[in-house]
């Protein structure tokens, strides 16, 4: 989902801060698109390229999210700790209840407490700094951020990309402008190009003016330098690296790898790592999951049980009592 922009002070309601934070609470990961060329200021206003500071943008977004989480817990921290003590509940369970609706798992809370060496038994002694440290680490674990260093095709972006990479590990240089240009050229049959490709081919019949030729030369140089425009790469890295999803292909015919209409590999489902054939069946349809009997690995033709751990790019036939297969 696309969410509202953020400016300093969002955790206190400045600008569209409340809307941003409401959107962000639903997210499992965040792609932070920054102007790597430094051609906008902190409030998104155009400036001369190189004047803006994208590293500041990266830092303040993280800080606003951390402050927002901390404000939720600090509001009545002592009461929260007493509730955990009085009801004999684990501290992480009580915190998870307070943060309900934020897509934060209780296990992530428990791991964060342990990693920071914070005391569960003496949680009422946590300082404001302890709570902020906890929220920072929890946010990093439960809502990881990947940086899309956009406008990387501009000269002023190079130094800024190095600066961001010196302090952040998940950074992808990209050019949304070049990606749009390549997609439009492909749509008009001037080139052959698929999102994420490291190169494109100019069609023999393509008629282009000098400006279009220069634009393609610029795109080619960018692809040679970075391997892609970065747009598809950042989506792939978010899904497969940060969120650790796998892609699985359900089929009706495990021999021809088709659905009942004869379409080859018609569907692809994203599932969390360690998902099972039953999980896949339930995602396709609740009734299919209820009647799940077994699955078949289309490659090996082996029968798979309900608890088998699916692997990335598995092609699976589901056999169910409620429907012969999917």
Label every PLM stretch briefly:
Residues 28, 314-316:
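Structural signature of the urease/amidohydrolase superfamily beta/alpha-barrel
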Residues 48-60, 68-94:
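Single-stranded RNA-binding surfaces
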Residues 1-31, 37-60, 125-136, 323-326:
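Switch II of P-loop NTPase G domains
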Residues 77-314, 321-324:
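C-terminal-of-GTPase-core extension/linker across diverse P-loop GTPases
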Residues 25-36, 63-70, 157, 169-170, ...:
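Non-catalytic alpha-helical coupling and interface elements of nucleotide-dependent molecular machines
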Residues 18, 55, 70, 212, ...:
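N-terminal accessory targeting/assembly segments
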Residues 4-7, 35-41, 48-54, 66-67, ...:
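Conserved nucleotide-binding/hydrolysis micro-motifs of P-loop NTPases
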Residues 1-4, 56-68, 144, 276-277:
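A short, hydrophobic secondary-structure junction motif
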């Amino acid at each position: 989902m696309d969410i509202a922009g953020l400016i300093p002070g969002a955790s206190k309601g400045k600008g569209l801060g409340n809307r941003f934070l409401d959107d962000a609470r639903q997210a499992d990961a965040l792609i932070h698109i920054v102007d790597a060329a430094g051609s906008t200021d902190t409030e998104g206003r155009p400036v001369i390229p190189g004047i803006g500071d994208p590293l500041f943008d990266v830092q303040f977004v993280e800080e606003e999210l951390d402050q927002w989480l901390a404000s939720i817990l600090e509001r009545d921290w002592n009461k929260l700790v007493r509730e955990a003590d009085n009801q004999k509940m684990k501290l992480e369970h009580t915190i998870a209840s307070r943060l309900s609706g934020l897509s934060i798992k209780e296990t992530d809370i428990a791991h964060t407490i342990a990693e920071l060496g914070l005391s569960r038994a003496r949680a009422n002694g946590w300082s404001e700094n302890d709570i902020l440290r906890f929220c920072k680490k929890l946010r990093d674990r439960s809502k990881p951020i990947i940086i899309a260093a956009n406008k990387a095709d501009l000269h002023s972006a190079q130094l800024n990309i190095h600066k961001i990479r010196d302090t952040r590990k998940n950074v992808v240089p990209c050019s949304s402008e070049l990606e749009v240009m390549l997609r439009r050229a492909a749509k008009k049959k001037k080139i052959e190009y698929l999102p994420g490709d490291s190169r494109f081919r100019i069609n023999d019949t393509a008629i282009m003016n000098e400006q279009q030729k220069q634009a393609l030369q610029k795109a080619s140089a960018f692809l040679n330098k970075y391997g892609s425009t970065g747009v598809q790469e950042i989506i792939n890295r978010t899904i497969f690296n940060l969120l650790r999803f796998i892609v699985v292909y359900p089929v009706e015919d495990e021999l021809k790898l088709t659905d009942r209409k004869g379409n080859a590999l018609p569907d692809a489902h994203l599932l969390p790592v360690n998902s099972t054939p039953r999980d896949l069946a339930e995602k396709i349809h609740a009734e299919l999951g209820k009647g799940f009997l077994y699955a078949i690995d289309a490659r090996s033709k082996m029968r798979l049980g309900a608890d088998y751990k699916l692997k990335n790019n598995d092609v699976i036939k589901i056999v169910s009592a409620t429907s012969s297969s999917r």
